[in-house]
Every structure is written in structure tokens, then in C-alpha cells.
């Protein structure tokens, strides 16, 4: 049997079981725990490669062939770190494992048959993960969307109305009209987009109107006054409509200290921004919120972990 060196194998098919990959410019190292391929039966598209009629491409007329296959991808998800082919059918993942031609290759899954209608996407040397969710977006410009997609982000949650002072500061799309216009503008983009309404009000109708207009929740921001009253009202309406609330707490402590904010939250679930304190809020006391079971703490650009 002809053999190639490990270096040549990685160059052709990407890393395999036991290989370690550094993640970007971080100090994090990912080790591949399992490779679903059958060595010697790998599929690959291109000149002199295997995705050809009768080879890795099935000629059987009755098989349920894939619409697309991502070949030899390194996958990182909640189940582990592994190497596999990813089959796509009708716009959804049909299977993960060994893809190819069941008539000529060993180990090919029933739902991973490559046929004449299958598009090939090269995954060699690339990492595949679930789409990232960015939960803190100031919607200033449409150019943010392609930049996020290039980074693997497929869901963006935040607020704003474009390059306005309120947008730069608060991640809020305030009011029924602004929310509807942002949703209308979002229709043309291949990105999952969600918009926060303005939670800084004690006006129950104003809160409800924003949810009915399409807001996925409320943002309470200190620039509009993160007082105990508006925290309580926004959480009341959020519970009624089963939506979320995010908060940027009060840096100046003019509406109360961190203890007053936690009392207004009252054990209800809330997403606290800048919980490390570097980006604002009850700095540095807001870090106390990270110890509360009902609070989802978050950090943003002022604190970037896993880098030098």
C-alpha cells in the first residue's frame, strides 16, 4: 500500500485524529478527538481527486443524494472536536460523518451519499462551528453585516436606527415606527437580526407597543436612566410577553447603587452588559451580578479574553 507522510496528509485532507490546531492568535489549542473518514477512502473535489462518476460520486439512480457536501472539515461544537464530512439537503444539515459512494466506499452513511446533483465545498484546513450569536450590536451601518458573516456570526442582536447619537450609545431601536423600519430594512440581508426596544419607560403601553411592533425584548440603558422603576416595568412586560431584557447599569449611581438594581430585578432573568465593569455600569461593583443565578453576565470589547 502506498503511504504518504502526515505532513502531506494534512496538506491534502486537513488535520486528523490527534492533530492539534491553534485557534487564531489565541493561546487556545484544539485537538481532534476523532476522524470519521476511512483512510484511503477520503473524498475530495478537484483535478485528479475522487469526486467523480463511479468513484466517490454514486451512479445509483435511487439514492437520496445530497445537495451539497462539505468535505474533510474540522468541527467544533458542544459534542466535541472531530473531523468529518457534512452533508446538506434541502438547506439543512442531513448528516455528519463519512460521505461518498456507498457502492464503492466503506463507511459511507445512508444520508451522506454524494451524487451527480451534489455541490462540493472544500472544508480541508477549515474549522466549522455553529453560527456565532453576537448579543450586543449597535446597528450603525449595514456594512457591519458582511463583516460579521466573514467572522462566522449568523445572528446579531442589538438596537439602533443607523448613525444616530442614540445608536452609538445605547443599542436601542426606540418606539414602534423605528422598530418596524429596522425590520423592513433587515429583510434583504442573509443574517438573523433581532432588535431591542426601549425599556427606559414606566409607560406600559409604550413597552407593549414595541413588542407588538416586532422587538425581541427591551434594552435598559443608563444614558436614558437605568432607574429601579424602569427596570421593574420592563421586566414585568417582558414576563408577560415572554421576551428578554438587557441592561447597562448606572455608572453614576444616580438612580441607585448595585444593591438597588438587584432589588429591582427581583430574581427575574436579565442579561447584564459590561458585567466586568470596564464598559460602564456600577463599575466595579456590577461584577457582583455575576454571582446571581438569575443573571446572564456579559462582557464586550473593553475586556477581550484569551488574547495576549
Swiss-Prot record:
Family, per entry: Belongs to the metallo-dependent hydrolases superfamily. Urease alpha subunit family.
Protein name: Urease subunit beta
Gene3D superfamilies: Metal-dependent hydrolases, Urease, subunit C, domain 1
Subcellular location(s) of the protein: Cytoplasm
PANTHER family, sorted: UREASE
Metal-binding is among the record's keywords: yes
UniProt domain Urease: residue ranges: 131-308
EC number: 3.5.1.5
Transmembrane segments: none
Broad class of enzyme this protein falls into: hydrolase
Residue positions, PTM N6-carboxylysine: 219
Post-translational modification: Carboxylation allows a single lysine to coordinate two nickel ions.
Predominant location: cytoplasm
NCBIfam families from the UniProt entry: PRK13207.1 (NF009686)
